[in-house]
Design a protein with these regions (language model features):
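N-terminal membrane-targeting/pre-transmembrane regions
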Residues: 1-32, 104-108, 114
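Hydrophobic alpha-helical transmembrane segments of multipass integral membrane proteins
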Residues: 16-23, 42-52
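Hydrophobic alpha-helical transmembrane segments
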Residues: 33-43
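Conserved beta-hairpin
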Residues: 46-80
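Non-transmembrane, membrane-adjacent beta-strand/coil modules in membrane-associated proteins
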Residues: 70-126
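Conserved short beta-strand edge segments in small beta-sheet-based binding/regulatory domains
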Residues: 139-142
Length: 142
């Protein structure tokens, strides 16, 4: 079964603020200084478009014994039998290097010996229940 990444209004606002700020400055400045505004506006708009593309291409799929995590071109597979524990996470700051989730409330999956990953499926409880059906030895930490 496939699960989409949860959506956070907070993340959208944080990514839109620079675009709107540069656009506002560009509107209220003299015409000569508008040329200075276009490069930052272009960069922030491009970053917002990339963020949007990443959001719409991020999903988590449970395929038999494998958890597939997909984000645009990057895909990773985790054997569900190797998942040790799942921890609910509500922190905005994440210590994980790889974080294919677009909401600050998600779950951290610990697998192998030292590996972990943060994801944010829309239906966390249903997602965890399906993982537990395949591997009932997964420890759930609240």
């Amino acid at each position: 079964m496939q699960f989409k990444s949860a959506f956070s209004t907070f993340n959208v606002i944080i990514h839109l603020i620079p675009v709107l700020l540069v656009l506002t400055i560009g509107i209220f400045t003299e015409e000569d200084s508008n040329l200075i505004i276009f490069p930052p506006l272009g960069i922030f708009t491009l970053l917002f478009l990339i963020f949007t593309i990443l959001y719409f291409t991020t999903y988590y799929e449970i395929q038999k014994e494998v958890l597939l995590i997909s984000m645009f071109f990057y895909k990773t597979k985790i054997k569900i039998s190797e998942i040790r524990s799942i921890k609910y996470s509500n922190s905005i700051i994440k210590t994980n290097f790889y974080k294919p989730g677009f909401h600050h409330k998600g779950i951290e999956i610990m697998y192998h010996k030292y590996d972990d990953i943060f994801i944010s499926p829309e239906k966390k409880d249903q997602f965890i229940a399906q993982l537990l059906e395949i591997n009932p030895n997964i420890e759930i930490k609240k």
